[in-house]
Amino acid sequence: MLRQVKPKNARTKRALEKREPKLVEGAKTAIFLRGNATSQISLDVLGDIHALKKPFSVNFQKKNNILPFEDASSLEFFSEKNDAALAVMATHNKKRPHNLTWVRFFNYRVLDMIELGIVNYKSIQSFSATPIVPGTKPMILFQGPVFDAHPTYRHIKSLFLDFFRGEPIQKLDSAGLSYVIVVSAAEAQEDETKPLPLVHFRVYGTKLLKTKTNLPRVELEEMGPRIDFNIRRVQPAESDVLEEALKKPKTQEPKPKKNVDVDIIGNKVGRIHVDQQDLGNLQTRKMKGLKRSVEEREDSENEEVEIEEDVISDASE
């Protein structure tokens, strides 16, 4: 736990204000760490994922004697020090070779973790496609019903979306959609004794070709990395902590609009309630043909006088 620093000048105050919680969070920073023992394959995969995450990433070069599933206090320290919400750690041993541990934090405390082992790997340098421009926002596609049906694969889907989503934006030019991340898996078997299906991680670059219409024709070219993961240890988030992490501030929730509906076409339909109006004194356009004569006006005035006299006489009786 880092000590709380009181700002002594304006620069320190601005730096602390950047770390304060915001209604709309920006892109999440990820830290990339090496364990006490690593393999070249795990380090190469770590470097390729770091290239996909740039510029919202911090890469550590030194080894760290950290066992995330036994003691995550060091990871939480690095998370708070670097203001990072994500972490990936590369390790290697006889029991779990070529291992990557993916970690998410909430309030600089570990929210959930998952271990993915590297089974097959082909680096970015092995492909001749144009490299990714740092900061480009990817499209993400999950293939297979298992990502909605199985809790572990739902966990992977949520983590990858959180990891690669980048900075939130309102609009995006089609020319900025330069690559797509495809994550696929076969359907999981009901037999729990059998291992879970592999997670296939692919990255494709997009080529926009001219057509006779306004919409371009899209072609995909694999640009790497190409990785096959097998699922190892999983530490899901606790229900109360996850509920707190997913809570939305009241100011972010749009206020419901009364008496406003949207029809099947998408048109907004509103209902207005108006009080009953008194049309007796409504000023209308006067036309000569509708004007009353002098005799008609005198007769109506005499009738009103007679009615008033009758009312007075009834009251006196």
From Swiss-Prot:
Cited Pfam families: Brix
KW rRNA-binding (keyword) present: no
Comp. bias (Acidic residues): 296-317
GO MF entry, a single one: rRNA binding
One GO cellular component term: nucleus
Superkingdom as given in the UniProt entry: Eukaryota
The entry's keywords: Nucleus, Phosphoprotein
SMART domains tied to this protein: Brix
Any one biological process term the GO annotation gives: ribosomal large subunit biogenesis
Predominant place of localization: nucleus
InterPro entries to which the protein is assigned, alphabetical: Brix, Rpf2
Ranges for region Disordered: 287-317
Keyword Transcription recorded: no
Sites of Phosphoserine modification: S293, S300, S313, S316
Segments forming domain Brix: 28-240
Compartments reported by the entry: Nucleus, Nucleolus
Subunit (UniProt): Component of a hexameric 5S RNP precursor complex, composed of 5S RNA, rrs1, rpf2, rpl5a/rpl5b, rpl11a/rpl11b and syo1; this complex acts as a precursor for ribosome assembly.
The family this protein is said to belong to: Belongs to the RPF2 family.
Protein name: Ribosome production factor 2 homolog
Organism field: Schizosaccharomyces pombe (strain 972 / ATCC 24843)
